[in-house]
């Protein structure tokens, strides 16, 4: 699976894989599918753009 082709602000299901339960972007070193720096930079931009458009939450409610 080629992630650069799939990483887009409209592809919310792929972006949710790289966000933890609090809505934060998971660091590059902790991602399960290892992303390159360029791919992670594209991921960050796409997540931020999806947040601005209301497709992803900025922060979810705390469970505690």
From Swiss-Prot:
The record's Gene Ontology biological-process terms are: translation
**Keywords from the UniProt entry:** Chloroplast, Plastid, Ribonucleoprotein, Ribosomal protein, RNA-binding, rRNA-binding
Q: Name one GO cellular component term.
A: chloroplast
List where in the cell it is found: Plastid, Chloroplast
Q: Which domain of life is it from?
A: Eukaryota
Which Pfam families does the record cross-reference, listed alphabetically? Ribosomal_S18
Bridged cysteine pairs (disulfide): none
Q: Which GO terms describe its molecular function?
A: small ribosomal subunit rRNA binding; structural constituent of ribosome
Q: Which Gene3D superfamilies match?
A: Ribosomal protein S18
The UniProt entry's sequence similarity note says: Belongs to the bacterial ribosomal protein bS18 family.
The record's section on PANTHER family has: 30S RIBOSOMAL PROTEIN S18, SMALL RIBOSOMAL SUBUNIT PROTEIN BS18M
Q: How does it assemble?
A: Part of the 30S ribosomal subunit.
Quote the protein name from its UniProt record. Small ribosomal subunit protein bS18c
């Amino acid at each position: 699976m080629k992630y650069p082709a799939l990483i887009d602000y409209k592809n919310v299901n792929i972006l949710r894989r790289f966000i933890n339960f609090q809505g934060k972007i998971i660091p590059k070193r902790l991602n399960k599918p290892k992303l390159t720096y360029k791919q992670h930079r594209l991921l960050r931009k796409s997540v931020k753009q999806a947040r601005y458009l209301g497709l992803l939450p900025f922060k979810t409610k705390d469970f505690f």
